[in-house]
Amino acid sequence: QMSLYLAEFAKALGFQVLLCDPRQEYAQPATPIERTFAMPDDAVQQFAPDAHSAIVALTHDPKLDDLALMEALRSPAYYVGAIGSKANQAKRRARLAEHFELSQAQLARLHGPVGLNIGARTPSEIALSILAEMTAKRHGLSLTASPFQPKVST
């Protein structure tokens, strides 16, 4: 499952990780990753994100993801992301604005579709792309232009 890959990769890079999914049927086998079965909005509040926190919603279930995102976007977390297509992101932003009264400034902080475009196809590749975006943002890098692309003079 992608959330477990992301959690393991993030832990390897020194992130403190909390995996939240209230659905018992998706419980992972025993791992060294801290886990909670709390509702996502409660988990975000209890986590008390600060400017060094990253929060990513990965369930594809708006009833769960939107709750987490509502709290995350109201927090000082440096990175808030959600999996889903551009069309789903547009619907999500509309729901968050309408039902949770989030401002346009708060909604502008939402990364989605989440992750850098590296052509990821598998859950582990998608997790890697998400962590790459989180890491770039953590280091204050602009994701609009790659520092590795040569400048072309005309």
Language-model regions, residue ranges each:
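Glycine-rich adenosine-cofactor-binding loop
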Residues: 1-21
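Residue-level detector of alpha-helix initiation sites
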Residues: 1, 62-63, 87
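Conserved SAM-binding strand-loop segment of SAM-dependent methyltransferases
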Residues: 33-39
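Adenosine-phosphate binding glycine-rich loop
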Residues: 83-154
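Short amphipathic alpha-helix with an adjacent loop that forms part of the alpha/beta core around
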Residues: 40-51
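Short loop/helix-cap segments at secondary-structure boundaries that form the rim of catalytic
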Residues: 24-33
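ADP-ribose/adenylate-binding Rossmann-like module
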Residues: 54, 70-95
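Residues in the short beta-alpha loop(s) of Rossmann-like NAD(P)-binding domains
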Residues: 21-23, 86
